[in-house]
């Protein structure tokens, strides 16, 4: 009778350690890839926005730096 609680505890400890299914791993990879793509797109948009602001400030101060 003492073996039953030990067996149950071992089952509880072993179940979270079970490997993830392939489908779950693929979903995690796709989510991570999507976040990476989103970061890159945001960064490019952010950098181009900064360049536009810097260009407009430069044009207001000195017209020789304007690209137009």
From Swiss-Prot:
Expressed by the venom duct. GO terms for cellular component: extracellular region. Residues 20-54 form a propeptide. It comes from Conus litteratus. One of its GO terms (molecular function) is toxin activity. It is found in: Secreted. InterPro entries: T-conotoxin. Keywords: Disulfide bond, Secreted, Signal, Toxin. Residues 1-19 form the signal peptide. Pfam families: Chi-conotoxin. Contains 2 disulfide bonds that can be either 'C1-C3, C2-C4' or 'C1-C4, C2-C3', since these disulfide connectivities have been observed for conotoxins with cysteine framework V (for examples, see AC P0DQQ7 and AC P81755). The cysteine framework is V (CC-CC). Belongs to the conotoxin T superfamily. This is Conotoxin Lt5.11.
């Amino acid at each position: 009778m003492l073996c039953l609680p030990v067996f149950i505890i071992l089952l509880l400890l072993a179940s979270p350690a079970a490997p993830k299914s392939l489908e779950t791993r693929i979903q995690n990879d796709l989510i991570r890839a999507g976040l990476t793509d989103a970061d890159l797109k945001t960064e490019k948009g952010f950098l181009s926005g900064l360049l536009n602001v810097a260009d407009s400030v430069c044009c207001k101060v000195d017209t020789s730096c304007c690209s137009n």
